Swiss-Prot record:
Superkingdom assignment: Eukaryota
Originating species: Saccharomyces cerevisiae (strain ATCC 204508 / S288c)
Region (Disordered): 325-352
InterPro entries: ERT1_acuK_gluconeogen_tf (IPR050335), PAS_13 (IPR056751), Zn2-C6_fun-type_DNA-bd_sf (IPR036864), Zn2Cys6_DnaBD (IPR001138)
PANTHER family per UniProt: GLUCOSE STARVATION MODULATOR PROTEIN 1, ZN(II)2CYS6 TRANSCRIPTION FACTOR (EUROFUNG)-RELATED
Subcellular location per the Swiss-Prot or TrEMBL entry: Nucleus
Gene designation per UniProt: GSM1
Primary location: nucleus
Compositionally biased tracts (Basic and acidic residues): 335-352
Protein purpose: Transcription factor which regulates nonfermentable carbon utilization. Binds specifically to 5'-CGGN(8)CGG-3' and 5'-CGGN(9)CGG-3' sequences in the promoter region.
Protein name listed in UniProt: Glucose starvation modulator protein 1
UniProt KW keywords: DNA-binding, Metal-binding, Nucleus, Sporulation, Transcription, Transcription regulation, Zinc
Amino acid sequence: MTKKLPSELKQTRKSIQTACEFCHTKHIQCDVGRPCQNCLKRNIGKFCRDKKRKSRKRIEKHGTQPYLNLGKRLVIHDVPSKTVSPSSVHLQRDFLSSDQEKPGKTPAHNTNIQYTYNINDNFQSAGSIPRITNFNTNNRQTVLENTSNNISASQAVHLMNDPIIPTVRKSTLNLKSHFLEQHKAMQQPLATNCLVATSNVPVHSGMDDSNKSDDDVDDETNIHFDSMWCNDEYMKLKDIVDISTPFLPNNSQIFSLQESEYPNPSASTRGNSSLHLTNLLNSTKSVNDQKDSSIGHSTSTFNTYDEVVSRPFISLDMLHLNRGANANTHPSHNAKLESECDSSSHSDADLEKHDTDFISPSKFRELVKTPQDLYDNKCLIKPHNYKLAYTKLLTTLRKKFLEGAEIDKSASVKDEHSTQKHNLRYDLEVIIRSILERYAPIFISLTSNMIEEDLLLQEVTLQRALLDLENMAKLVSCTPMCIWRRSGEICFVSNEFYSLTGFNKNLLLDRTSFIFEYLDHKSVSNYFQIFNELLAFGYNDINKRKKLLMLNACSSTSSKITEGFSFTTDGKAIFTKCNLLLSNGLYLKCACCWTVKRDSFNIPILVMGQFLPIFEMD
């Protein structure tokens, strides 16, 4: 219990009106004397003076609104009648200083905060949570507004075309023209003492009149999220879809090849909803060439935009790699289309001429044998050209699947030949679809903020991990082992793998070779579906993902996922079966384990495959 203080001591501890500066700073009890007792005890009596307090700003209470310091203005944009998207309502609060009462003084600063509301047409009175889209602080500048002057809605500042958060669900071409217009507008001098009135310019203003009908369809399905991160993510995913046909008004034109033209007897349960991506690859280049000739000089402007906005170091441009000029999709021209695919495909040697910095894995291992050599020769390491790697990969897959369909034409039974031909085509479509739908969106989201130095660090991490895996292969010398990049390029092959398959070491490591060249069609299709769905970026619910794979598996004989595969708890390895190509042209059934190695960005950089042959007893 606290001891009661005598009355004399209570008088000395009684609070006073104003304390000295020292007692105020130290938060101790001061007295009315000057100097006070606390300052005398510390021999600082000559510095004892009253603490000056700031004067309170009192607002004169008049009954009129114009004398308030806080001015609110609600501006509703006039939205065209053809659009059904939610209208944009902008609430601007101008926090003016109290110098309206004292015009003789110079104001310190002026702060403008603009909020954006999305209000449904059916509920004009209901508001949503505001989000700040622009925050401007102008020092040494005052915007004095007279509330008696009413500002009409046509003079309001429209932020629907704000370049920070552009409107989504638009084509890549329209977004480019929109950003170019905004960039030119930002270069013009702005007024200093007033808000510049702008008109509600649609996003499609840069397009021709012939495309207005298509733009109206886009406006009807316009979606504007309440989060700038959702808008940014949606635009990235939209670019993946629009990158195939950036100059086509309707993406459905590239899918003119219907399921009825290529009937698949074993895939009848899927109906005609399957998209033939092989024809997409063959027709994209020719259609874009026709569009380029009509657009003319505007294409160079868009290329300039790409250099500013796009990410220059990361690319998955797998849909513009076809050099064929024929995009005819009639069934009678299938043989001509396939011959053009074979004639237009480039060999690995021709593709490597475009990459002057290419070093084969065997030559690189001669330079770098230890981790110390890796860091000593770090100046020789450059980011790997994955764009060229995916170009070679697409050429290899088309050569493997489409040439396989041509070879099977010599079969004795015509029905069996036709079924096998369609299965191979469908397998290639399943592979490309799994890359575009499963792998590409996650990969783009993970690499959106990477710079060139990050790619260099990723390559150094890959080479350092490769050295550790090679040392492990020497310890576990009884298992045939092969290591490849996420693009399928082989980086290391153990001696046991050479003994198992019978291939020469120089054949695999002295050039760009892919692991898919040494697997059959069924194993390649299984690998891409399992890798893109489960192995590349990990998985959470194993049973759910496994069931999803089984349901989405192709119904053709050569594309069914092997039922006997299992997972590890950490999501880095999968056990399954495959058919490995031997040097004599035959395939050997093997049990394999695919283990992925990821970097700090959770991006797969290496895949290690271990193979054990399965000998069946007669």
